[in-house]
Amino acid sequence: MSSCSTSTKPETGSLSGKVILVNDTGDPALDPIDYSGITVALYNLAYLDTTIVRINNKYPQIGVHINQETEFDHRYQQPVAKTITNTDGSFKLIEIISGEYNLVYFKSGWGIRYVYNIVINKGENIISDINAQITDNHKISNMDEGSKAKITELVLYPMKYLSSTIQNAYVFQEDHCYLITQDTSFLSSVVFQNSAFGFVNPGCRIDFWNSVSMPESGKRWWITSSEGIFTSELNIPGDDDNVLKIRIANYDGNIIRNGKISNLMDGLEINSDDTIITKMVFTNGFTAIVLNGNNLNINQTLIKSFKSRTNVFYGNSNISQNIFYNNYDNLIIDSSDFNVNNNYFISNWVGIRPIYGNTIIRNNCFWNNVYGISMLASNPLIEYNEFFESKRYCIQTQPNYVQVYFDHCNPVINHNNIYAINQIAISIKPDAHDGYYASGGVGVINDIDATYNYWRAIDIDNVLYDELDSDIIHYKILFNPRINAKILSAGIQ
């Protein structure tokens, strides 16, 4: 008796189309001879992190809803298929397993474009007949690209190379690409239109000295490192060599919105007042944002995968409805009176690090951070938050040595849901080897008010580190009276 098995080959299809080069500069020297030599490549969809998708679904009012536009960068993948256009711009990709992909096409000197969520069916697929969408199943607030729309043609425009100083008002045009090869200053107003791409060579800085504006909705503009942008193969930009720094100064009241900034080292620096950063995506790099000013607001923004200090803030500002994910020394608030509310801090080394000042930390969610809040000589009000699964401490205090004496912390910790069972919830002495600023000294000079909280632990002393745990600590963490039921008004509202 014998048996045999057969394997079914997956259904495959082809994709054909045409890319044209359009010289809209008015310079006849840039007129193309033909449309050959354009690279066309097909990539698997970017992975949508299930952690962020879960937060998007549970709290749709915070952060940015991720999709292919926010997550896809062709430099992080090998292509599924690729080819080069003929003289008339035509191309054909063959033997593609049926499914959904992202299409990338580029030519040196002519920029690069992405088309998201291309569906390849069995048999022949022609680009002009294919429906594509930019947001897949996760909608972006105030965007109307969720419905599928016909692609009539693929177009590339000449790359624009920017000089070191631009005196007049400047527009980053829709669907155009810009390469910055040296430090560049914009002295007059700047407009970013939808889907404008700016590529900055490693080591370069961009300064905006006047107003900067961009649309409230529509396709996102993007600023990133130029490293590896014009190759179809895997070529992840190296953060160590990229000193890309974007500085906005001298003009109050800018609204930075609806864009994506990636692969930074020194980050976006704001040196002006009344600036709003909203509906932005910052990803992959060292420092995301440095704020130097007053009345600054960051809201409905996603900041993820930064390897060093993610944010350094000075001045008085409001940080609300953001997602901070997978960063290192995450939200540093230095010498400031900040209001930090309705944010989700997840899988960071440090969620918030207040340094001096009287920060209000209210209605946030801290999940799976090594340290939820690690304060240094600060007096924050910590209320109506939720703390889940901190790997070391939910909250710790640290002193700061100034010349011949120590400055200490005096937090007020009330009305929080604290779910710590197998780790320390609150410690008033930091671990000297792990905390970035940790001195090993006791962080307070008085008892700490941690009353009116809900505790999952039955024996609360087991999740505290105070005078009962060390001979050098002479102060208590006061937890009575306590709340016996989960506080419904705590956490993100």
How would you label these PLM feature ranges?
Residues 1-25, 154:
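Bacterial Sec-dependent N-terminal signal peptides
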Residues 47-90:
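Short, acidic Ser/Thr/Gly-rich low-complexity loop/linker segments typical of extracellular
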Residues 93-95:
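Short, flexible loop/turn segments at beta-strand junctions in immunoglobulin-like
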Residues 106-138:
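Structured interaction patches on ligand/partner-binding surfaces of diverse proteins
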Residues 97-99, 176:
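A glycine-anchored, Pro-Gly-centered beta-turn/N-cap motif
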Residues 8-10, 128-141, 145, 154:
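Conserved "repeat-terminator" motif of extracellular CCP/Sushi domains
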